[in-house]
Amino acid sequence: MSEALTELASYLGEARGNLIAASQLKYGELTLTATGENLIPLLTFLRDDAKCGFVNLIDICGVDWPQRELRFDVVYHLLSPKKNLRIRVKVATDEDTPVPSACGLYPGADWFERETWDMYGVLFTGHPDLRRILTDYGFEGHPLRKDFPTTGFVEVRYDDAAKRVVYEPVELKQEFRNFDFMSPWEGTEYVLPGDEKAKQ
């Protein structure tokens, strides 16, 4: 599998190196980094080129890196059924710079982009219906951002006496605790970001 990905990375560098800002083959996974203006041409090439054939969009997700100037990564996971290969394409952006929508290439991108906007606040230009998909209508903020409080801002519950859903400020029943535990499960052999202290 990694041999096929190595060949694919080499081919992409030769055929469309101008669209790829960086390429990384690590842990048996190929990740391409692109800029916002090169995203749609790169995704189009990956879908339409006979040596690629990435016709399936598996997922779009966001990653929040608050310490970076371009704090968000929008990550596209693609599958080539004919080649039996998966690839990842990343685009970095900030709170104010929108990313071009991939709905014209992959109709399934619609709800994935809505989810990424809902959870992280990343805007997508050209999206046909960019609105919340998982949070409530009046929800404020984006809950997967690292600066969003883990307790949230409001509590939503059904009030049996009033026979309706009510919104109230969050009231913690006990003193807030912050635990810094090591992960109890046996994970990968390589060190993931944030696990550096585990080796000490």
From Swiss-Prot:
UniProtKB keywords: Cell inner membrane, Cell membrane, Membrane, NAD, Quinone, Translocase, Transport, Ubiquinone
Name of this protein: NADH-quinone oxidoreductase subunit C 1
HAMAP family: NDH1_NuoC
Membrane topology according to the record: Peripheral membrane protein
GO (cellular component) term, any one: plasma membrane
PROSITE patterns documented for this protein: COMPLEX1_30K (PS00542)
UniProt family annotation: Belongs to the complex I 30 kDa subunit family.
Catalytic activity: a quinone + NADH + 5 H(+)(in) = a quinol + NAD(+) + 4 H(+)(out)
Species of the source: Rhizobium etli (strain CIAT 652)
Gene giving rise to this polypeptide: nuoC1
